[in-house]
């Protein structure tokens, strides 16, 4: 078992995408050749697409690579060393910091917060995801800095009660 990694059947479902683009001109979006690194915050076309889906502005979207765990690590690391946009100081300078960890969950995510010294607070998981009554109570504590939210494989869904909480 490889915790959250797609199986061969799931990968095979998207194999046809590898042959969709056959002309290099199809690899240019808003003047950017997408075969190269592109823009740091993501391609403009992708930001417009997801802004429409999410009901926000394109400039509020960050489009990263396909390695969600890497993006999560980078975000926690940056907050730890520099703080977040509304932080008074970097999280490493705080007297205490906690992270909500729905359990059962993914050990790789938990290892990130463990390695930065967070107190990991277990949140029970129901058939619909983390127990939101517990989450809503725990986030009243200003030391709580985040919660691990992981999509359900194989359908890549999440529950509206957490997304809109």
Descriptions of predicted regions:
Residues 2-30, 140:
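Conserved N-terminal helix/loop that builds the PLP phosphate-binding region
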Residues 26-27, 31-165:
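Conserved core of the PLP fold type I
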């Amino acid at each position: 078992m490889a915790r959250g990694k797609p199986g061969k059947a799931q990968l095979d479902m998207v194999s046809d995408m590898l042959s969709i683009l056959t002309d290099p001109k199809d690899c240019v979006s808003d003047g950017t050749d997408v075969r190269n690194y592109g823009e740091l915050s993501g391609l403009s076309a992708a930001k417009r697409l997801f802004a429409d889906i999410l009901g926000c502005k394109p400039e509020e979207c960050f489009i990263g690579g396909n390695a969600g765990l890497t993006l999560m690590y980078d975000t926690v690391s940056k907050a730890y060393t520099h703080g977040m946009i509304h932080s008074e100081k970097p999280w490493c300078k705080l007297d205490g910091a906690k992270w909500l960890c729905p359990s059962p969950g993914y050990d790789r995510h938990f290892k990130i917060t463990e390695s930065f010294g967070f107190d990991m607070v277990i949140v029970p998981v129901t058939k619909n995801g983390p127990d939101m009554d517990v989450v809503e109570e725990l986030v009243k504590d200003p030391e709580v800095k985040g919660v691990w939210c992981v999509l359900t494989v194989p359908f890549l869904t999440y529950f509206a009660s957490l997304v809109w909480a």
